[in-house]
Amino acid sequence: MNTRVHQGHLARKRFGQNFLNDQFVIESIVSAINPQKGQAMVEIGPGLAALTEPVGERLDEMTVIELDRDLAARLKTHPFLGPKLTIYQQDAMTMNFAELSEKLGQPLRVFGNLPYNISTPLMFHLFSYTDAIADMHFMLQKEVVNRLVAGPNSKAYGRLSVMAQYYCQIIPVLEVPPTAFTPAPKVESAVVRLVPHAVMPHPVKELRVLSRITTEAFNQRRKTIRNSLGNTFTVDVLTELGIDPAMRAENISVEQYCKLANYISDNAPPKES
């Protein structure tokens, strides 16, 4: 028996396809999302409609983004979903979510069982549109969820933790075993809720600076900050900002990374006219 075939569709490895088929898990996810009529619900990677059907039952219309043309075609001809769906057959990484929000006239509620091979870059793409997003619910590799929620002084804490927590409040919802999917992935999964901050707790002046600092620090996470960020900050500056130069990347809080980023923005040499 070919375990990569589900409902007549061959799961494609290059799209990272694993189809959810556990009814209890599906109902738990839909209950956590709690979709309401009139909301701008957007599903990324609907696949064989395991979540699309129960969510669609509660709505008059919804938007889906599906890269696989065969699956997009199946959705278009779905007996009850078809007329309710606006289908974008494209890569979600190329989607302008701000334009979509403007078109739908309200912030988006985004959800999906994300392909694990693109989940991290896709979340970074979505973070750049948090002004247009009300909330997000995603099925992810459990290890990625652990990184999203991790705090300082833990192995899981990294650049993804800092950037995700800069943009959003992050709430784990439930854990999902491999047996809930066809084909069964080799990893544990989990559902997470991300709610963009209405007011940024630690606003930075230039996001690209925060992104650069966290990349530099975590690329050399075993080094002390005095060494990994030594080209940017002197020991005196670190001390002045309340950051021990002997700390490593994983010891520094989101708030402290934001302080470092703002220091660079405030002290950058003026641009030549």
Curated annotation (Swiss-Prot):
EC number: 2.1.1.182
GO molecular function: 16S rRNA (adenine(1518)-N(6)/adenine(1519)-N(6))-dimethyltransferase activity; RNA binding
Localization annotation: Cytoplasm
Pfam families in the record: RrnaAD
Principal place of residence: cytoplasm
GO CC terms, sorted: cytosol
InterPro entries cross-referenced by the UniProt entry: KsgA/Erm, rRNA_Ade_diMease-like_C, rRNA_Ade_Mease_Trfase_CS, rRNA_Ade_methylase_Trfase_N, rRNA_adenine_dimethylase, SAM-dependent_MTases_sf
Keywords assigned: Cytoplasm, Methyltransferase, RNA-binding, rRNA processing, S-adenosyl-L-methionine, Transferase
Function according to Swiss-Prot or TrEMBL: Specifically dimethylates two adjacent adenosines (A1518 and A1519) in the loop of a conserved hairpin near the 3'-end of 16S rRNA in the 30S particle. May play a critical role in biogenesis of 30S subunits.
Xref: PANTHER family: DIMETHYLADENOSINE TRANSFERASE, DIMETHYLADENOSINE TRANSFERASE-RELATED
UniProt-listed HAMAP family: 16SrRNA_methyltr_A (MF_00607)
Protein's name in the database: Ribosomal RNA small subunit methyltransferase A
Organismal lineage: Bacteria, Pseudomonadati, Pseudomonadota, Gammaproteobacteria, Enterobacterales
Gene that specifies this protein: rsmA
